[in-house]
Amino acid sequence: MKEAIAILTGGGPAPGMNTVVGSVAKTFLRKGYRVIGLHEGYTGLFNPSPRTVDIDYPMADGIFNQGGSFLQMSRFKPKDSDFENNFNLKFFTDNNIKLLVTVGGDDTASTANRIAKFLEAKKYPIANIHVPKTIDNDLPLPKGTPTFGYESAKDKGAVIARAVYVDARTSGNWFVLAAMGRSAGHLAFGIGEACHYPMIVIPEMFDKTEITVEKIVNLVISSIIKRKIMGMDYGAAVISEGVFHALSDEEIRKSGIHFTYDEHGHPELGKVSKAHIFNEMIEKKVKELGIKVKSRPVELGYEIRCQTTIAYDLTYCSELGIGVHKLFAEGKTGCMVYVDSEGNVSPLYLKDLQDPTTGKIPPRLVDIKSDKFSSVVETILNAITPADYEAAKQYVPNPEEYDFHKILNWK
């Protein structure tokens, strides 16, 4: 029987999913393997009738540059009991599968490791290689290397953000944007930097003080006042949704928003418009202060996850897909495929990235100590400093409370 590989996609979509799947398929087909695509992520491996598709070369070529994921995705994460009671070992043995390729985030990678260990215990060892994916750019790849999909999502987000900024200048309004990023602020920061937004708020900025609703609002108010002093009655702020994940339960209650929570205890941010929440809080504060300004909310959410992949990610994802075969041919397993800026392929072992205490892969955060971040704060952001206190008194009696550095407790 011809040897086969199985490939699945887990978690949420990101631009480049189909490029990875298509590139993996093309490479292995040329080497004589059968390529089996699994729909619904890991769900199919834990029931007797998985939804599968044999991917041939024309199909791989057809999906290569399409947005979304040809293989339907799922966030299903099996319990330990599922392995003993529901795992479809017959799928692997009947199809002579030698490699499981998983495309997703850290949860998808961890489950792949569990499956490989389970199959080894059942005397049917297979290789597993993971392709790291997230528009949040928060997987701990070597410095300067993005996760695939991030650059495309940033590009599409910036298209919207640029148009919004032009609208702000044209109409004399402010806009409050919210960008995805549960654990890290890479997407919000990247979009804000690209579009020269006068205020960017990400969770990493609160390294010396607790994140509160008041501080988030005051940062935007600081920018509004500073711009007025500069003679500009318009502007835009982009805020990472990750600030909500860092808020205490008490602070979330203060926001007045009633969240539902997922099984892991995280507020289900996808069910509400974060931009609307932020905008309402800001509108309330400017009204209390008597500052004349209109603001409008814009959510940078699900619509950027399935956008057409830009050239950067088309190339990068192709290299990742081809790199999977290189690592497999070298006998590598239990690893993520990594491609450096020169196109060199190497493995990153999940065991080396995991937190030794929790076993989880920690997120890569925005480096607020970097020259890049500092230059954005110093040259692009507009916010109150001590030099503005006197001029700011025409808008607020206590301008020091809206001092950018004091809000964040930065020296």
Task: Give the ranges of each region predicted by the language model.
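Short glycine/serine/threonine-rich phosphate/pyrophosphate-binding segments
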Residues: 14-24, 45-46, 82-86, 106-114, ...
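N-terminal phosphate-binding or glycine-rich loops at protein starts, especially the Walker A/P-loop
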Residues: 1-49
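Accessory alpha-helical/coil subdomains and C-terminal extensions
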Residues: 35, 91, 99-104, 110-125, ...
